[in-house]
């Protein structure tokens, strides 16, 4: 697929029911978005994908928006979305406690490592650990609870996402091999799915608020979009990282005086350091935020 910028209408029933498209609604500067992505792509010698869903107009704009990128830890809000959907159906509760042995721990488990048997954690704590702290063992426990990758894929397909795919558990899903479609998404697909989970009607109101809160509480993404967020704006996000220089973030951003944006940025196939990729994502975010501020009436 060629690296082109695309602008298209998204047919999302909940979106069209909840917002009106009218003259003067906020828009994103497509040329600036494309230029920012290409500039960072060339600087990092990377492949970069960006999508911005403007909920005021129902438009999504993207650069490499239909190309596949490694999910890495951006899959964790999806896992907890599936868990919350199960809770909405009465299958179990957030306060249900589980115990797990030390042998269950995998690399990067800053929270769960403190709660092995005889201690316990409930699902609220585990999703907080997975989303806000990117705890890998917590993510695996949630994935196992909902039925593994196959169940995640069934859920995604049921809400209209037949692109994003879950195949493995942490940490194996972070291999990020070029051309490997396992555990991948596209910037446009995951932006639409995140919209449905956080702003749509896929989850009950309480569950939407809970998922949003876990992402608002993100403790590991300060160097990315949060570092350039304008005063008075809010962000709920989840970052990811993997092999082949993969770095990513998905987010819902609430500007101070306009409707939310759903933003996804994915970087892969680069030898850049994580710091360099973080700075690149921040600069892309700055371009998006500046363009948005310039268009708001």
Please tell me what each predicted stretch does.
Residues 26-40, 56, 144-145, 149-150, ...:
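Structured C-terminal helix/loop/strand segments within mature extracytoplasmic catalytic/sensor domains
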Residues 8-20:
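Bacterial N-terminal signal peptides
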Residues 47, 119, 140-199:
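Mid-domain, small-residue-enriched loop/turn segments at the edges of structured enzyme/sensor domains
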Residues 21-25:
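Sec/Tat signal peptide C-region and signal peptidase I cleavage site
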Residues 58, 70-100, 263:
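Active-site SXXK
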Residues 41-69, 92:
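Short, conserved catalytic-motif segment at the N-terminal edge
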Residues 55, 94-111, 146-147, 173, ...:
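Acidic helix-start/capping segments at beta-turn-to-alpha-helix junctions
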Residues 105-141, 149:
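Conserved catalytic neighborhood of penicillin-recognizing serine enzymes
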